[in-house]
Amino acid sequence: MPNSHGNVLNNISLNSKQNPRSISKSCPNDKDARQKSFKTISAQALVRVQGAGYKLGDVKLKDAEVKEKNSLKKYDCKNATQEKKEQEQVFEKTVAKGSVQKYITKTSKTNSLFIGNLKSTVTEEMLRKIFKRYQSFESAKVCRDFLTKKSLGYGYLNFKDKNDAESARKEFNYTVFFGQEVKIMPSMKNTLFRKNIGTNVFFSNLPLENPQLTTRSFYLIMIEYGNVLSCLLERRKNIGFVYFDNDISARNVIKKYNNQEFFGNKIICGLHFDKEVRTRPEFTKRKKMIGSDIVIEDELLASNNLSDNARSKTILVKNLPSDTTQEEVLDYFSTIGPIKSVFISEKQANTPHKAFVTYKNEEESKKAQKCLNKTIFKNHTIWVGPGKDKPVHNQIGTNKKTKVYLKNLSFNCNKEFISQLCLQEKIRFSEIKITNYNSLNWTFCGHVECFSRSDAERLFNILDRRLIGSSLVEASWSKNNDNILNEIDYDDGNNNENYKKLINISSMMRFRTQELSAHQKGLTSQFQQVVSPFSSYSNSYTNMNSLVATPMKPHPAFNLITNTVDEKLHQPKRTKQENAEILESLKKIINRNLQRISISGLNKEENLRSISEFIFDVFWEHDSERLSHFLLMTNTSLESQKILQKQVTRAAESLGFTV
C-alpha cells in the first residue's frame, strides 16, 4: 500500500509537469489554486486506491467515462443534423403549397359588381335568392356600419364568370329592387381616375319632367354606343352624366346628341372633368389635345346659348342656418323648378349664411321669390329676393347715380358728422338720412343724396372703407339687404317708437356726450393729424380721434335719456389688476394677429406691451369694459379684427415703427 501510494503521487506529479509553459506563465495566485486542486485530487485518488485496492481499476473507470461522454456528444450532433433536415423539408413543402395556392388564386379571379342605393331592409340572403339563377354566382355582401350593424345602402355581388356578371348588370341595372331603383356597376377603387379619363359625358337641359325619360330608359339608350359603367340623372337640375369605359364611345354619343333634340328638348352634351382636374396647369394642354369644342368646363356654361338673362334667373336667399348644405338648399328650392346651380357664401361658424340659387327659367325664379319668401327653413325664417351682383368698391366710372348708401355707421358717424364732413369737403347734398339700425353689430345704415355725380363720387371715395368711431364704414351704389332681418327701422325724428327699445340696451346707453380726456388734450397737433382721418376738424366738435369708439356727440335719438339715467350710467373705476388683465388679453390677441400686419419688430415683448398700452389709453380711454367686449367680438367678427389691425397700425406709426 505504501508503494502504491507513492506511485500515484509520482504519476500525478508527472502529469502536472506535462505543460510547464502554462505553469510558468501563471501568476502566483494561479499557482496556489493549482496546488490546492492537486491536493484535492491526490486525496480523492488515495480514497479510490484504498477502496479498490489497485491503480488499474481507477484508470479503466476514467476511460469508460470519457468514452461515454464522447458517444453522447456524437448522438446529440446526429440528432441536431437530422432535426435540421426535417425542418428544411417542412419549409420546402410549405413554400410549394403556398405557391400552388397563389397560382390557384390567380387563375380563379372573381368578378365583383357594386350594387348601390339598396333599401335598408335588404339582406344578403335576399340578394342570393335573386342572383343564384346565374351558375357562376358565388356570394353577396351587404356593407354595414361597424358599430350599429345597420346597412349602409350598398354591397357587392361576386361571380366566377365575367359573362354572367355582365348579364346580371344589364338585366337589373336601374330597375326597382325591393322598392328602390338600384345601381349596378363594376367594382372600381379609383373612381377619380374613372371620372377623368375622358369618358364622362355631361348632358344639359334634359326634359326630366317627361315620365318616359327614366334612368333605366336613359341607360338602355346609352349602352347602344358602348359599355356604360354608370349613369346619373339629376332631376333637380335637369342634367345627366354617363360614364363609358372608353373615350371612343363618349365621342360618338357627343357627336350624335350635342345640340340635337332629345325627347322633345334641344340638349347640350360634352366631356366633363372634375373641378380638381380643370384647375391643374396641364389641363389647358390636355383640353387642346382632346378638342375644346367637346369639353364642358362647368355645367353653368351649358346654358350660355339660352336667350334669357342669367341675372334675372338668380335669387338671393338670406338668414340660412350656419350648418346648411348645398343639397338641403337644392332639395328645398327645386320644388319650384329645375335648378342650374347653388352657391352658399362662406362665413364664420354660428353666423347666418346666404345663398345664390340660379333657376333654369326666369318664370320659376319669380315664382320662388313669391312663394318661398319669409318661409321657415330649418327653424329659420329665410328672406328670398332677386339676386344682385356683389358690390364692387371703387368702380365708379360706369355709375351714374347720385345716392350713396352707407352701412356700418357708428354712433359718432351720425347725421351731424356727415353734414359737417360735406361742408368741409365742399360736397353738395340734398338729403342725409339714417334709415336702419343693425342689432347684431350696433351700427346704423343710411344714405346721402348728392346734387351731382361728381359730389357722390367724392363722398364715396372719402367714406368707403374708412374707420370712423371703431366701425369700418362701407359705401355702395345700391342698397344692401344682408342684415334686413336684424335691422330696426329708424327715423331721424325723436318720435320713433321702435327706436325707444334701443334705450334699454345697457351696452349702447354708455355712448354719451363726453369731452376729450386730459391725456388726449395734451397730444400734439402732429399726432392728432396721424390718428385722425379728418385732421382739419380739430377746432370743431368732431375733432375726436376717429378710432375712439366713444363719440364726441351722441346720436340724436339718445337725447331721450334723462339726466337721472345718465348719472346711473357712470361706471365704477376699474382697479389696476383689472386693467392689467385686459392689457394682457389685448397683448395676446395682438400677437395672434401680427401675421396679418407687416410691421417688423412688433413681436418683441416690450413692443407688444407698448402697443397695447397705447391702444388702451388713446383709442379706448381706459374703458376696460368696452375694450373687453370688443376683444370678445374679435373672435367671431371679421370687422372687429380689421378694426384692431387698423388700431395697431396707427399705434405703431405713432410710436415710431416703420410701417
From Swiss-Prot:
Cellular component, GO, one term: nucleus
Any one GO biological process: mRNA metabolic process
Pfam families tied to this protein: RRM_1 (PF00076)
Domain RRM stretches: 111-189, 199-267, 313-389
Keywords (A to Z) from UniProt: Cytoplasm, Repeat, RNA-binding
Compositional bias (Polar residues): 1-27
Subcellular location: Cytoplasm
InterPro entries to which the protein is assigned, alphabetical: Euk_RNA-bind_prot, Nucleotide-bd_a/b_plait_sf, RBD_domain_sf, RRM_dom
Alphabetized CDD domains for the sequence: RRM1_PES4_MIP6, RRM2_PES4_MIP6, RRM3_PES4_MIP6, RRM4_PES4_MIP6
GO MF annotation, one: mRNA 3'-UTR binding
Main location (coarse class): cytoplasm
Region Disordered, annotated ranges: 1-35
PROSITE patterns noted in UniProt: RRM
Further remarks about this protein from its record: Present with 98 molecules/cell in log phase SD medium.
Subunit relationships: Interacts with MEX67.
UniProt-recorded name of the protein: RNA-binding protein MIP6
Organism: Saccharomyces cerevisiae (strain ATCC 204508 / S288c) (Baker's yeast)
Lineage: Eukaryota, Fungi, Dikarya, Ascomycota, Saccharomycotina
